[in-house]
Amino acid sequence: MKLYSINTGHFKLDGGAMFGVVPKSIWNKLNPADENNMCSWALRCLLVEDEGKLILVDNGMGNKQDEKFFGHYYLHGDDTLDKSLAKHGFGKDDITDVFLTHLHFDHCGGSIIKEGDKLVPAFKNATYWSNERHWKWATEPNAREKASFLKENILPIAESGQLKFFNVNGQSSGVSLDAANTNALPSHDSCLTTHDSHLISNLSFYSVSGHTDAMMLPKINYKGRTIVYMADLLPSAAHIPLPYVMAYDMFPLTTLNEKKAFLTEAHENDYVLFFEHDPLIECCTLQQTEKGIRQNEVFKLREL
């Protein structure tokens, strides 16, 4: 097996939204904001080469949205998906599978490209993987989350015939958060469960539902270590402390429970955490401190 970090650029999000109830006087020391209160975040994907497959985990924001859209998110940096793939000797046509942790625009925007007036898969030889629960959540979005689920990123995947679903068992949230149901929020318990991907023998995944329903976190056995792609359960190393939960999360108390369960397991088993959005830290391990579980060693994926 070979693993490659695939950087697709950086973007900006409001620091308050990214750190939730944590005061700016604290989080601003971790990721300093600009004059508009915006912090810079990475769009870091993962490429897995194993058993004759080339699996891309997430694919960034893409480039098909208009200037106004990108103006909201300040896409910046020299890295692109194409450049980063080429750096390792690959192109989009080499990708056999695209593993979508979830369908927010900054994770799946590179799935679809424009060819003239048509929207077509960027990875023409690949199978795109989601799960039925999350697909339904994304294609029938609640009003709070709707702006993150862009139809042009999602629907053409199904229309292409290249979409398949992983089997994610367990109880769904069972709720629509539209205006008619705002008083019907459920008790949303922790859903940290592990599933076999059946793609390659060394790849399984967690499903978690605090950030969005049935998000998937790849769990990879590599060189005797376990690497977990954190997606938006822990978007950065700064989010390791339990109260550091994004305001974007649909069910923050569920996130809190999922983080606690995951961090305990990860610390006990010396997992390597791979961060999708940390602007500086690619990977870290964990240690127990007086304040709880915190980051320990920090390193690049290629150093493993």
Spans of model-derived segments:
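Zn-dependent metallo-beta-lactamase
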Residues: 1-56, 61-65, 69-72, 169-170, ...
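Active-site gating loops and adjacent loop-to-helix segments of metal-dependent hydrolytic enzymes
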Residues: 22, 67-68, 233-249, 290-298
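Short amphipathic alpha-helices and their capping/turn segments at secondary-structure boundaries
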Residues: 43-51, 84-89, 118-120, 217-228
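Residue-level marker for buried hydrophobic side chains located in beta-strands
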Residues: 55-57, 99, 128, 227-229, ...
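Metallo-beta-lactamase
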Residues: 62-63, 73, 76-79, 84-90, 94-106, 122-187, ...
